[in-house]
Design a protein with these regions (language model features):
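C-terminal motif of bacterial Sec signal peptides marking the signal peptidase cleavage site
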Residues: 15-18
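Flanking scaffold residues of small Cys/His-coordinated metal-binding clusters
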Residues: 11
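Secreted/extracellular ectodomain signature
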Residues: 20-122
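Bacterial N-terminal signal peptides that target proteins for export
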Residues: 1-8
Length: 122
């Protein structure tokens, strides 16, 4: 009779290494913003799209805190990009920010990927 230890070991390893990763919002090249954030800006005729990846270590998982920080970083980056171009954008509607969350239980890293469209003020 064969030992099932290798199969059980593989299944346990797969379960332990499983993690949820957020869905990427863009294929554009990301630029580092700070130690937790990277972003990409895609020009549009009516403004630009901003996509960010935000992640940080959390001993106790609080996805809502990471989601709030992620949306805040996205908003700040959008206004900074507009300021650098010497233009103003319409206020970002938080309801239109697409967001995806994930957590790696082994490393304690909670991640967020978000995207929003910033429209130029007329």
């Amino acid at each position: 009779m064969r030992s099932q230890k290798p199969a059980v070991t593989l299944v346990l390893a797969a379960l332990l290494s499983a993690c949820a990763t957020p869905t990427r919002q863009t294929d554009a090249t990301m630029v580092t913003y700070d130690k937790d954030t990277e972003y990409a800006v895609t020009p549009r005729a009516d403004g630009f799209a901003v996509a960010i990846n935000y992640s940080r270590y959390q001993f106790i998982p609080e996805s809502s805190a990471v989601a709030t920080a992620c949306k805040s970083a996205l908003t700040a980056i959008a206004y900074e990009v507009a300021d650098k171009q010497g233009r103003k954008i319409s206020p970002l509607n938080e309801q239109r920010i697409r967001i995806s969350m994930g957590r790696n239980g082994l490393t304690g890293i909670t991640s967020c990927s978000a995207m929003a469209v910033a429209e130029w003020q007329l």
